[in-house]
């Protein structure tokens, strides 16, 4: 595919460039053709959410960072869409959390599993676990049941962006704490995971890495202290700049304890009332 000739000044530049990453993923054998459809669905929800990282997503990101940091054996489960969109950030998250990266795909293909592994290695991963065909989690029938014995099989926390509902439910039934990223707050995955970040993977992943790094270095309070207190009210929908950095993260000092059902309710209300834009 020719390099993009979309100028950065195009009003839909980010969206179009992201779309090209998914197309390139298909051409490279990383992403399933079905992934194009999944991406389009994500785009539609993102459009309705104003293509912004809302306060409910920031709260889920902060909770995810804490849970990943406290995990004994965290694993990042990578599929074809996540890899094409964010290989570098997934590797960075593995580095920050000490989590293992494991390939796990819905649409069965040994070649694509290998292509995903290669792309993660190119992005700097030191180790990428493959699902194999010897160990499986329970409560699921299709290809996604296969796991690595040193990865998802023994994981206590699994970060799995763009998951399908069946496997998310199976992971939970297998005793895992599941953190997902899904722009659709109505999906079965969103409702089944313990933590759902309703945001675009490309926006929230750098923020999640940053949140974990802040926990690692003990700078979380400083980041929050610099934040705009007006954003702290969890009952108000706040659009946070797409390129938010540590100094623009909202202050959650007085936010109530994390609740995934509240996150989903706020995301759904934002969608239905059109207040995302
Ligand atoms: O590589 P494979 O074979 O594992 O296939 C991966 C896909 C994503 C194709 C597969 O898991 C699938 O079909 O997923 P679903 O059931 O379509 O769910 C994808 C969910 O992710 C949908 O709810 C989309 O709204 C959401 N989504 C799509 N793109 C993004 C997203 N959420 C966050 N960020 C995105 N960029």
Where do the protein language model's features map onto the residues?
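Electropositive, gly/pro-rich neighborhoods at or near active sites that engage anionic ligands
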Residues: 1-99, 111, 259-277
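Alpha-helix C-terminal capping/helix-to-coil transition sites in glycosyltransferase folds
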Residues: 70, 153-154
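Long, charge-dense
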Residues: 92-145
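Short gly/pro/ser/thr-enriched loop/turn and capping motifs at secondary-structure boundaries
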Residues: 107-112, 185-189, 204-205
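Active-site glycine-rich loop that binds ribose-phosphate moieties when present
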Residues: 134-153, 159-166
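A short, gly/pro- and small-residue-rich
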Residues: 165-186
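C-terminal functional extensions of proteins
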Residues: 188-226, 241-277
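Periodic short-repeat tracts
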Residues: 228, 232-242
């Amino acid at each position: 595919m020719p390099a993009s000739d979309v100028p950065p000044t195009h009003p839909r530049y980010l969206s179009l460039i992201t779309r090209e990453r998914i197309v390139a993923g298909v051409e490279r054998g990383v992403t399933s053709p079905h992934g194009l459809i999944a991406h389009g669905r994500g785009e539609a929800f993102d459009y309705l959410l104003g293509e912004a990282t809302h306060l409910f997503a920031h709260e889920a990101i902060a909770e995810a960072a804490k849970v990943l940091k406290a995990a004994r054996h965290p694993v990042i489960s990578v599929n074809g869409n996540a890899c094409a969109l964010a290989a570098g950030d997934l590797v960075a998250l593995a580095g920050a959390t000490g989590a293992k990266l494991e390939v796990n795909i819905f649409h069965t293909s040994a070649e694509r599993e290998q292509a995903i592994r290669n792309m993660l290695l190119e992005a700097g991963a030191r180790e990428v676990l493959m699902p194999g065909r010897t160990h499986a989690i329970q409560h699921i029938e299709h290809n996604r049941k296969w796991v690595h014995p040193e990865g998802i099989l023994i994981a206590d926390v699994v970060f799995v962006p763009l998951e399908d509902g069946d496997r998310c439910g199976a992971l939970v039934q297998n005793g895992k704490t599941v953190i997902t990223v899904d722009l659709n707050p109505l999906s079965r995955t969103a409702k089944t995971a313990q933590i759902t970040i309703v945001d675009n993977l490309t926006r929230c992943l750098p923020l999640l890495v940053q949140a974990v790094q802040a926990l690692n270095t003990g700078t979380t309070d400083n980041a929050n202290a610099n934040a705009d207190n007006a954003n702290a009210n969890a009952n108000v929908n706040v659009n946070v700049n797409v390129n938010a950095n540590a100094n623009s993260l909202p202050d959650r000092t007085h936010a109530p304890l994390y609740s995934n059902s509240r996150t989903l309710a706020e995301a759904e209300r934002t969608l239905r009332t059109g207040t995302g834009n």
